[in-house]
Curated annotation (Swiss-Prot):
Cell wall formation. Catalyzes the addition of glutamate to the nucleotide precursor UDP-N-acetylmuramoyl-L-alanine (UMA). NCBIfam families: murD (TIGR01087). It catalyses: UDP-N-acetyl-alpha-D-muramoyl-L-alanine + D-glutamate + ATP = UDP-N-acetyl-alpha-D-muramoyl-L-alanyl-D-glutamate + ADP + phosphate + H(+). This is UDP-N-acetylmuramoylalanine--D-glutamate ligase. GO terms for cellular component: cytoplasm.
Length: 422
């Protein structure tokens, strides 16, 4: 079979290796290629303009490529990674799948839930860690998948046993074109889920037509305290706060529902689940606190690539002066809601990246103190010169990092290095 892989990344490379083993002809097409060549694994790589849909029998799209891209528009046999993997399942091997999506918190919740389900041989994949085709080849029985809106947009058949949607706030609007498309992508899987599946959804979306018309069983949630009350867990029994408490509560709720499906009793597992969860360490660059040589508090929240994540960060330091580094690739999102929230905080802004001028204009409009620094190192230097012991220095950019860095991880590492440098 002639297979075209649209986009040359981790997901499609894993698929290419699988296709090659099964004697298929594989070609990559990507905007990053300016001429035909072979990559380091010997795969054929072509510029996007060379794609001929009549010379292809199957196209698998890398989730980061927008539905408006000419490659996607020209494709005649387009499938998502999820749908292709779903087509491989049969009576011999079909894993149990739990999918987790949301604007924020999906990585943390996926990691927490995978840890809780260790005894059931759970493995995580999708957006984090392992591509789905590698989980398939390992025949892992239980998949906990961090699932992006991009993957959900392209998926037309595959569905999980349990779908958890943590939240939906404005993000990725450049890719989706508008918020309605973004929300619909997050909810699309509910149109595919049968009566035997379960969706756990924020209460505020209860009346949405997609949810109303879905056959799936549904549980709606609002606050972490209410979830924990239903699970008969005191909120002070968990060592997390703010958004991380909600992530933990939702991981426990999914775990409890999974046990129920398996005809196992929650009370037999509850105490051990709490012990495991309280031993969980939040990953780097997510509200990661550290101190400089003068003992002043700095917080690396580089993973805050959208407004909602920064709003959550601000709540944590409600009664302290905050020196906030903000800016980067804002992905077409209107930052006004962030500036409206600044009215409730004592905050000084240090604007970096490609959105610095937009941030400066909004700061003037909302009468918020703002220095245009452009570079992260300059922002750190400015804060170092004024930061008091009882104040907070916070990197929570509300923006992606790719205008200046290779990833949010690099942005966070450089932030820490600049702070700790003499």
């Amino acid at each position: 079979m002639k297979i075209s892989l649209l986009g040359h990344g981790k997901t499609t490379l894993a698929l290419a290796r699988f296709f090659k083993k099964n004697h298929n002809e594989v070609k990559f097409f990507d905007d990053q290629f300016t001429s035909f060549h072979k990559d380091r694994e010997g795969f054929l790589c072509h510029p996007s303009k060379d794609f001929n849909p009549n010379d292809s029998q199957l196209e698998v799209v890398s989730p980061g490529i927008s539905f408006t891209h000419p490659l996607v528009i020209k494709a005649k046999h387009l499938v998502s990674e999820y749908d292709y993997i779903d087509s491989l399942f049969d009576l011999v091997f079909t894993p149990t799948i739990i999918s987790i999506s949301g604007t924020n918190g999906k990585t943390t919740t996926t990691e927490m839930l995978t840890m809780l389900l260790e005894d059931f041989k759970a493995v995580s994949g999708g957006n984090i860690g392992t591509p789905l085709i590698e989980l398939f080849e390992k025949q892992s029985p239980l998949w906990v998948l961090e699932t992006s809106s991009f993957s959900l947009h392209y998926t037309n058949k595959a569905y999980p046993l349990i779908y958890l949607l943590i939240n939906v706030e404005a993000d990725h609007l450049t890719w989706h074109c508008n918020f309605e498309n973004y929300l619909n992508a997050k909810l699309k899987v509910l149109t595919l889920m049968p009566k035997t599946s379960l969706a756990i959804i924020p209460l505020k979306f209860k009346e949405h037509p997609i949810i109303q018309n879905s056959q799936a069983q549904k549980i709606f949630f609002d606050k972490s305290e209410e979830i924990l009350e239903c699970l008969k867990i005191p909120s002070n029994a968990l060592f997390f706060k703010g958004a991380f408490l909600l992530d933990a509560a939702l991981a426990l709720l999914v775990y409890e529902q999974f046990l129920k499906i398996k005809n196992l009793k929650w009370q037999d597992y509850r105490e051990n689940a709490l012990k495991r969860l309280n031993a969980f360490k939040i990953g780097s660059h997510k509200m990661e606190e550290f101190r400089d040589k003068q003992g002043r508090l700095w917080v690396d929240d580089s993973k805050a690539t959208n407004i909602d994540a920064t709003l959550q960060a601000l709540k944590t330091f409600k009664n302290q002066k905050i020196h906030l580094i903000v800016g980067g690739d804002i992905k077409g999102v209107n930052l006004t809601p962030l500036f409206e929230e600044f009215k409730n905080h004592e905050v000084s802004l240090y604007a970096i990246g490609s959105s610095a001028s937009i941030i400066q204009a909004l700061a003037l409009e909302f009468n918020v103190s703002c220095q245009v620094c452009l570079k992260l190192e300059k922002a750190v230097q400015e804060i170092k010169s004024v930061l008091s012991q009882n104040e907070i220095a916070l990197l929570s950019p509300s923006a992606a990092s790719l205008d200046q860095f290779s990833s949010y991880k690099e942005r966070g590492e450089k932030f820490k290095a600049f702070v700790l440098k003499d």
